[in-house]
């Protein structure tokens, strides 16, 4: 799946999601992996510098706590999940780099995406280290 804020349709007047888009490739797996992919959006340019309180958006930690309260799960070490998601994105961008190299990339921004492989890999390793990897 591709569960993130820009793949959601929100109700026009109520604080609720009406639809989730881009789930044609969804799989069964650890639900926290998908949820933490959503949580990563808090660190991306769209939300990173926004006044979340003024927008009535919970902080990253608050959102994790709400999700875990609703699902009955304990809040895990999110660093492992962020590392996993960043590593997965690095793999995707490496695939894009291969298509750029082979001349089969369809997206006009493919080269820009491919350039993210190393920074995503480094960020993944940093989160893994925060979670205890050596």
Question: Locations of the language-model features?
Answer:
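Active-site acidic catalytic loop and adjacent metal/ATP-binding pocket
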Residues: 1-33, 37-39
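Regulatory N- and C-terminal appendages and interdomain linkers associated
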Residues: 99-134
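All-alpha amphipathic helical-bundle segments outside canonical DNA-binding/catalytic cores
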Residues: 73-85
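Active-site activation/catalytic loop segments of kinase-like enzymes and analogous catalytic loops
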Residues: 32-71, 85-103
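Short, conserved loop/turn and helix-capping segments at secondary-structure boundaries
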Residues: 29, 33, 57, 107, ...
């Amino acid at each position: 799946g591709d569960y993130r804020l820009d793949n959601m349709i929100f109700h026009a007047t109520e604080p609720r999601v009406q639809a989730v888009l881009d789930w044609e490739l969804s799989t069964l797996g650890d639900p926290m992996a998908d949820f933490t992919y959503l949580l990563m959006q808090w660190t991306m340019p769209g939300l990173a510098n926004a006044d979340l309180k003024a927008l009535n958006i919970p902080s990253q930690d608050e959102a994790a706590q709400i999700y875990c309260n609703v699902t009955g799960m304990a809040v895990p070490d999110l660093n492992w999940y962020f590392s996993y998601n960043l590593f997965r994105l690095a793999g995707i961008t490496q695939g894009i780099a291969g298509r750029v190299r082979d001349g089969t990339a369809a997206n006009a921004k493919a080269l820009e995406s491919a350039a993210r492989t190393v920074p995503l890999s480094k960020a993944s390793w940093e989160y893994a280290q925060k979670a205890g990897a050596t």
